[in-house]
Amino acid sequence: MAKSSREKIKLISSSGSKHYYTTTKNKKAPSKKIELKKYDPKIRKHVLYKEAKIK
């Protein structure tokens, strides 16, 4: 099987609710850490999510 060109990452909520989303990111493209505004169902608001590595 071929090696994937995408890296799995975790987007962690900045609200402190410990909620996270998982997604993939292109390994080869030079980029900064991802920061997205997404919905946090635990606090029922849109908050900033920051990229973190999956352990």
Curated annotation (Swiss-Prot):
- In terms of superkingdom, the source organism counts as Bacteria
According to UniProt, the name of this protein is Large ribosomal subunit protein bL33
Q: Which GO BP terms sit in this record? A: translation
**What GO CC annotations are associated with the protein?**
cytosolic large ribosomal subunit
Query: A Pfam family matched by this chain, by name?
Result: Ribosomal_L33
NCBIfam families for this protein: PRK00595.1 (NF001860), rpmG_bact (TIGR01023)
Q: Which UniProt keywords apply?
A: Ribonucleoprotein, Ribosomal protein
- Describe the family membership recorded for this protein in Swiss-Prot or TrEMBL: Belongs to the bacterial ribosomal protein bL33 family.
Q: Which organism is it from?
A: Buchnera aphidicola subsp. Baizongia pistaciae (strain Bp)
Q: Which InterPro entries match?
A: Ribosomal_bL33 (IPR001705), Ribosomal_bL33_CS (IPR018264), Ribosomal_bL33_sf (IPR038584), Ribosomal_zn-bd (IPR011332)
What SUPFAM superfamilies does the record point to? Zn-binding ribosomal proteins (SSF57829)
What lineage does UniProt assign to this protein's organism?
Bacteria, Pseudomonadati, Pseudomonadota, Gammaproteobacteria, Enterobacterales
Molecular function GO terms recorded: structural constituent of ribosome
